[in-house]
């Protein structure tokens, strides 16, 4: 499958606002012992720019040239890597915080599970993981079920037959199972209005923070 084309998706419509860190991450940031952060799918630096401004050494990985360029111009001190996160090898015992925000649900679960296991296995001891992914309560789930464009595979994964991409939906138990062995710091399943891009629309999201 192809990665989602964020260059096309956000071309000319994505406002560069002053990024504000996710509330849940900000709330537990004091649990992060060191200064090295890895952001898989950095996007426009929603979390990474505030983290860099707080003095963290942030490495951001993204497949989108647009996103990389926006981050570079808004925060030159970020260490930016242009790569598909499926092909990116996480250096062992290097990062005190590894995060991936609104990215993993755009992968087939086989790839996403591999990435999440790599996050868990390569995180430093006492390090933190932060992710958020679509839940099965997301309105897109029902839309995919009734759409001719999306083919239901299994395990709540859909294949977009037009552009050869995937969209996956998760349960809380599934996330807890993937990150078993970590101490759960925070987990929530919420349904909220997204004002971040395009017309206002709802998302069902699972947010998870775990400590090694």
Where do the PLM segments sit?
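A short glycine-rich, Lys/Arg-flanked "PGG" loop and its adjoining helix->strand segment in the class I
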Residues: 113-125
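A short beta-strand submotif of the Rossmann-like class I SAM-dependent methyltransferase core
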Residues: 100-103
């Amino acid at each position: 499958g192809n990665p989602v084309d964020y260059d096309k998706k956000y071309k000319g419509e994505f406002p560069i606002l002053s990024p504000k860190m996710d509330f849940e991450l900000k709330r537990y940031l004091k649990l992060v012992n060191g200064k090295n952060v890895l952001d898989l799918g950095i996007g426009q630096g929603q979390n990474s720019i505030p983290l860099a401004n707080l003095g963290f050494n942030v490495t951001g990985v993204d497949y989108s040239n647009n996103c990389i360029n926006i981050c570079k111009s808004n925060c030159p001190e970020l260490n930016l890597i242009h790569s598909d996160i499926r092909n990116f090898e996480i250096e062992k015992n290097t990062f005190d915080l590894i995060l991936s925000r609104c990215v993993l649900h755009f992968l087939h679960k086989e790839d996403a599970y591999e990435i999440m296991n790599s996050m868990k296995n390569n995180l430093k001891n006492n390090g933190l993981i932060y992710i958020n992914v679509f839940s099965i309560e997301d309105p897109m789930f029902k839309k995919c079920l009734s759409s001719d464009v999306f083919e239901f595979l299994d395990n709540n994964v859909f294949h977009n037959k037009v552009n050869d991409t995937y969209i996956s939906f998760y349960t809380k138990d599934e996330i807890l199972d993937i990150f078993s062995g970590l101490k759960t710091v925070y987990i929530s399943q919420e349904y909220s209005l997204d004002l971040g891009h395009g017309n206002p629309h709802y998302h069902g999201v699972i947010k998870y923070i775990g400590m090694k």
